[in-house]
């Protein structure tokens, strides 16, 4: 009885001290009367969305940083936001204080991709999904689909010959097909056209204003998203009936021990297609542009790739690529890194404050979005001298910590980056060893929204090399 009394007394004292601590913490926080970061919120509801997406993001960010400093507020895509532009602040949001900033997108994007997708979660559920994606996309797994990726690359390049192509659109088809083979394995061939039709409608509404009225891009996109989910459900049902174990991402999601619902699986499949397609296609488009504009770099990459072919001939090996070949491409890898830096396909990422947060002397209210500006960091002369210059040699030495984050940072960094680099290396190998290309039309323009792209998607003409070239 005495023990119970002591336990009750100890519990009471502990709770009292905890309450007093919480009160003092609240009063201390409130007494500071922290201001919001400087900046403007723009027009009601619309905010500064159009200013950001209709011009070079560097211009938007630079004008804000010049006027307000490295942290400022704005309003985009229906959300109040705080943008941060220093490597140290980005590390705090993405790594050091990641528990205070959950991954998020604007509500309209969550609805399109699916609220159960990996991007929007943290904790145990996120850890489980990340483990499953890494399991399917780790080197030991993706090396098995190199023949499939190579076949897609060869077929794609052959289809480009003799016609004027929009590089970005063609690369989207290539990366879409690679995404499907990595998610659905051999089953993708049966559903490719259905999936493509629905996804192409969905993507058109991705950056539209979230007005769900008949005829709007957003409304059409949401209908297409429902159809996509139905197709994925059909594939899941067929697999369960056949009781065949697949070594692809869908098989990983469907594992008996995982306990994922069909809705969770569908949301994450659609999310992975989104993550795997447009960004990688954008990188490939910029690579063709930068190689075309820098003959010495193109020559170095071509020589590296041709050397791989010569070694195979000398050793009597098949000319098909294998995993080891892709590890012998340091120059090409540096070109990819420099393209990721200069183009900065993803200008920023979204996080959300899970509570009122004191950050560098300012208040970030609970629920506000927080955007680390990768583009600003990648284009800062403090981090990369002559930042606008395309110079792959800068990656012969590692960049300073937290200054190069093309795939994000921390536990929410992109788990599919090995697959993305692999499919780029494979296509560049066949492109540089077999083809030559020329850019057509204006070459200095850039179009924005949602990704920065060469004007008109980089129109090019591709031709097969002859033995004399």
Curated annotation (Swiss-Prot):
One cellular-component annotation, GO: membrane
Cofactor(s) needed for function: heme
SUPFAM superfamilies documented for this protein: Cytochrome P450 (SSF48264)
Keywords linked to the UniProt accession: Heme, Iron, Membrane, Metal-binding, Monooxygenase, Oxidoreductase, Transmembrane, Transmembrane helix
Cellular compartment(s): Membrane
Keyword hit for Thylakoid: no
Induction (free text): First transiently repressed (1 day after treatment) and later induced (2 days after treatment) by abscisic acid (ABA) and dehydration.
Transmembrane segments: 3-23
Binding site for heme: 414
Pathway(s) the chain acts in: Plant hormone degradation; abscisic acid degradation
Reactions catalysed: 2-cis-(+)-abscisate + reduced [NADPH--hemoprotein reductase] + O2 = (+)-8'-hydroxyabscisate + oxidized [NADPH--hemoprotein reductase] + H2O + H(+)
Disruption phenotype: Silenced plants fruits have a rapid ripening with a quick colouring and associated with higher abscisic acid (ABA) levels. When disrupted in fruits, altered expression of ABA-responsive and ripening-related genes.
Tissue distribution: Expressed at low levels in fruit.
Family of the protein in this entry: Belongs to the cytochrome P450 family.
Name of the protein this chain belongs to: Abscisic acid 8'-hydroxylase CYP707A2
The species this protein was found in: Solanum lycopersicum
